[in-house]
Amino acid sequence: GFQTETLYLSGTGLGDEKALEILSKVKQELKLHICTDIHSPEEAEIAVKVADIVQVPAFLCRQTDLLIAAGKTGKFVNIKKGQFLSPESMKFATEKILSTGNKNIMLTERGTTFGYNDLVIDFRGIPKMKTFGFPVVLDVTHSLQQPNQSSGVTGGQPEMIEYMAKAGLAVG
């Protein structure tokens, strides 16, 4: 899949087939596992050709058809918690994946909306999501985003990465 940026001049990516060609080459040459976003059930079918992990983006984490399609791939599914969602609500997303018979699930904490142009990490969410029985990942860089800036481009606080990563490690 491709990531659409806020500012229309940022572009929308290479296209699915070209992107998968590049990911396949990276996978083969560097012997890496590949994780890629999917944005529609149809993209799940395409991504499974190369991806070891299909990732459901935060803004789409409640989309039943997408979650079920991701689960049906049989691959690991990483569900990024929406900035608008409580950690407890992620249980419903995992149940949709589990309904397909796929138990290969990971959850990602990536921050919670704090006002209009900021995100914060509520570290209590990590142990809460761990109670579902799946690994929880902390996406430090996304949690430090400052979306919807007046420039039309997402900003952030890269100088805080080290501190948030250490805090995430402390929480587990």
Name every feature range the model reports, one short phrase each.
Residues 47:
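Conserved structured catalytic cores and adjacent interaction surfaces
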